[in-house]
């Protein structure tokens, strides 16, 4: 082990997550270990900037915020190693979407409070989706998506529908919210 790999192993311990900064939908995201780190890093050369972060195992939990209100959460169980682009958009991926999520009420409230706080701290408008990992009884906020997907496979519309808001109503809410912006 030498050079950058040695430094990264000291900072994070493998495995690590490699991802381009300006992409979405997990495009270009890799879970790298010592053995495949260089190979995966080479695949990311086309991107201007990349992020290297600690890999956190655990359950995939997503929380949606609508305006300044907590909307709800969903759990994902991908058949693949993690919820990557193929797990999101391939018809063969068969990622399970679990709603309602089987967690304690206090944990549910905790996740929603963190998602709402992230939404407010980042000065977000409209709809956001915060991605969490739940591991060893703790929630880890991975990121807050300020432009979550709005397709028939997307999570926010699914969460909204579970809580009584159909897709048409969700889109109307977003349009109305946008109309309140003063330019």
Question: Could you say what each language-model-derived stretch is?
Answer:
Residues 1-58:
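Active-site nucleotide/adenylate-binding loops and adjacent lid/helix of ATP-dependent enzymes
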Residues 54, 63-65, 119-150, 160:
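Conserved metal-phosphate-binding beta-hairpin within the catalytic cores
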Residues 72-75, 114, 118-125:
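Active-site anion/phosphate-binding pocket segments in diverse small-molecule metabolic enzymes
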Residues 112-116, 168-176:
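Amphipathic alpha-helical segments that line or abut small-molecule/effector binding pockets
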Residues 151-154, 161-173:
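Internal helix-turn-beta structural module
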């Amino acid at each position: 082990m030498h050079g950058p790999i040695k430094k990264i192993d000291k900072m994070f311990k493998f495995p690590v997550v490699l991802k381009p900064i300006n992409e979405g939908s997990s495009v270009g995201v890799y879970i790298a270990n010592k053995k495949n780190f260089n190979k995966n890093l080479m695949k990311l050369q086309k991107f201007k900037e990349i992020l290297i972060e600690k890999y956190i195992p655990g359950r995939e939990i997503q929380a949606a915020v609508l305006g300044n209100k907590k909307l709800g959460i969903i759990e994902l169980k991908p058949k693949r190693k993690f919820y990557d682009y193929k797990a999101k958009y391939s018809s063969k991926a068969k990622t399970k979407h679990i709603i309602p999520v089987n967690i304690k009420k206090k944990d549910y409230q905790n996740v929603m409070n963190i998602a709402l706080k992230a939404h407010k701290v980042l000065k977000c408008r409209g709809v956001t989706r915060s991605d969490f990992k739940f591991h060893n009884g703790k929630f880890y906020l991975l990121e807050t998506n300020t432009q979550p997907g709005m397709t028939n496979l997307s999570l926010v519309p699914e969460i909204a529908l579970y809580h009584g808001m159909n897709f048409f109503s969700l889109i109307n809410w977003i349009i109305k919210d946008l109309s309140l912006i003063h330019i």
